[in-house]
Amino acid sequence: ATKFIQMLTPRDLSKLSVGQCKYVLIVNNDGGILNDPVLLRLKENHYWLSLADSDILLWAQGVAINSGLNVKIIEPDVSPLQLQGPNSGKIMEALFGESINDLKYYWLRELDLDGIPLIVSRTGWSSELGYELYLRDGSMGDKLWEKIMAAGKPHGLKPGHTSSIRRIEGGMLSYHADADINTNPYELNLGRLVNLDTDINFIGKDALQKINQDGIKRKQVGVILDCDPLTGPNTTFWEILKDNEVVGKITSAVYSPRLKQNIALAMVSINNSE
């Protein structure tokens, strides 16, 4: 399983310990990004990929068939739930006790909450303190929800959804918006997740070596939009023009109440990236 997982990602996993998580990229043979999941190592030969907004099951199964490795690939019956925000630590302490405060960033722990089996990781799709709870028994979903909401009530916990504001402020990607199969890691300033100077073998290594050597033609940047406050996130790409020529596109944009301005992620030609 370890050898197979390493085939999927250009990030060196040789020092990934049991109980540890890593943010990784999965790329195709051309170096294009297929997904940017969080990898969780539950046991010596047991891994989870907590995926972004694209499927990777058929890709992984196809790679496995042609790898000759003895691996089993399934979609686990788990229901991920995120608890994010400045008070998430206090709520987790109310649920699990003070020991939860020892859980390090990007590590996981197998826990039982009054008979509810969970994998808890200190990860999340926000730039705040946060946790992800993976429910391992779907029949206990209602019970888990009620317990979390009860513990969170004194701290103002409310149901929510993915926060475009917080993730754009933190420069976090949204697959299909900020990245897709035609985007490579270097265009997203994610070269740190590509370890070319190692002996590891992974899909797309030759292509990424060439891209790294030749350089990129476009690059993701953060921008401020000087206009009236946006009423919501963009739902289409917005062209960026310079001298009436298209030099890029806005991929994610939103108004930030904290920063009191419109902020965005954009993909622009390398000559216009400064």
State where each predicted segment sits.
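Internal amphipathic helical hairpin motif
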Residues: 2-33, 88-116
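Conserved, structured C-terminal
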Residues: 40-274
